[in-house]
């Protein structure tokens, strides 16, 4: 696999509260990355070898051959090599003999964070790019570029605190670090749990063990929080995310479906059975059977799992 070169490109500019992920050799443009290329590799299903390579450079130049060596010459002195699932697919075949000189930007993993709501992103279905032409890597590069620029635009539309939260959770993960470098993301090393509580008041249990989740399940937590912030109740976590990060469901259960004993804004409203009986059905109390509140007990048991 391609070696991480995070330390080669990335420095941290410290302020009183935040660190800024910046490129030491790059002047960041928050609306449009400067020196980058999109790469797509076609692999044979039987021989697992490279059959075709497409690339699209920031200056509009294209590449369409099957030679890795010629591709590397085409890439030249760019800073970022981008692609859809490039970390765990294309890079595995491109950088088998030598270390990767470029910082990798993967459009796949950041997409569910930035487009968590139905109908998600128009160019992505499951974990694949939607393309009009089969087996045309240059066309796939054009689609990946469109997706990347949409992701950068959406990132810059997020509130500052939401951007800081995602970057703080995921800054050390190779699937995200290239994108965060490209957009000049800021992050904090401490106080992430408190930031989550402030951003998600009334949306999650305020007594959930966020410190543990930040420490042990940062990716799953980020995807869960992105989904929780949606307004369309039909929105779901993509299947490929659950396959790679099965802990997402555990995190959502901990944040949203485990009523705390202390009581908080979320649990007192969303997980209180009497409150919801009144809100949804207009009744102030459950029926009893021979003096026993069996309906209420069943509802409480369902809430507690």
Regions found by a protein language model. Name each.
Residues 4-34, 106:
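N-terminal accessory regions of nucleic-acid-interacting proteins
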Residues 47, 54-155:
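Conserved DEDDh/DEDDy metal-dependent 3′-5′ exonuclease domain
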Residues 34, 50-51:
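Repetitive beta-architecture junctions, highlighting loop-to-beta-strand starts
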Residues 34-44:
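Two-metal-ion RNase H-like nuclease active-site motif
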Residues 273-305:
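Conserved pre-motif I regulatory segment
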Residues 123-215, 219, 224-225:
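Acidic, Mg2+-coordinating catalytic module of metal-dependent nucleases/exonucleases
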Residues 219-282:
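Interdomain "pre-motor" coupling segment immediately N-terminal to P-loop NTPase/helicase cores
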């Amino acid at each position: 696999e391609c070696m991480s070169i995070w330390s080669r490109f990335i420095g941290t500019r410290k302020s009183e509260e935040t660190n800024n992920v910046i490129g030491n050799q790059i002047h960041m443009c928050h609306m449009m990355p400067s020196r980058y290329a999109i790469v797509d590799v076609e692999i044979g299903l039987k021989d697992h070898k490279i059959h075709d390579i497409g690339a699209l450079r920031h200056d509009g130049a294209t590449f369409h051959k099957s030679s890795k060596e010629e591709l590397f010459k085409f890439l030249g002195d760019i800073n970022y090599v981008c692609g859809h699932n490039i970390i765990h697919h294309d890079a595995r075949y491109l950088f088998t003999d030598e270390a990767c000189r470029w910082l990798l930007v993967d459009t796949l993993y950041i997409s569910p964070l930035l487009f968590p709501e139905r109908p998600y992103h128009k160019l992505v279905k499951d974990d694949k790019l939607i393309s009009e032409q089969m087996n045309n890597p240059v066309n796939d590069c054009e689609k990946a570029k469109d997706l990347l620029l949409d992701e950068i635009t959406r990132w810059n539309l997020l509130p500052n605190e939401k951007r800081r939260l995602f970057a703080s959770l995921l800054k050390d993960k190779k699937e995200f670090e290239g994108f965060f470098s490209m957009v000049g993301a800021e992050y904090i090393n401490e106080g992430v749990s408190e930031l989550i509580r402030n951003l998600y008041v009334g949306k999650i249990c305020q007594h959930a063990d966020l410190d543990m989740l930040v420490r042990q399940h940062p990716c799953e937590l980020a995807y869960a929080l992105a989904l929780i912030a949606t307004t369309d109740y039909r929105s779901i976590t993509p299947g490929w995310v659950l396959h790679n990060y099965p802990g997402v469901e555990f995190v959502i259960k901990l944040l949203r479906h485990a009523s705390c004993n202390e009581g908080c804004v979320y649990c007192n409203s969303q997980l209180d059975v009497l409150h919801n009986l009144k809100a949804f059905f207009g009744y102030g109390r459950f029926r009893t059977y021979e003096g026993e509140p069996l309906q209420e007990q069943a509802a409480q048991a369902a809430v507690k799992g």
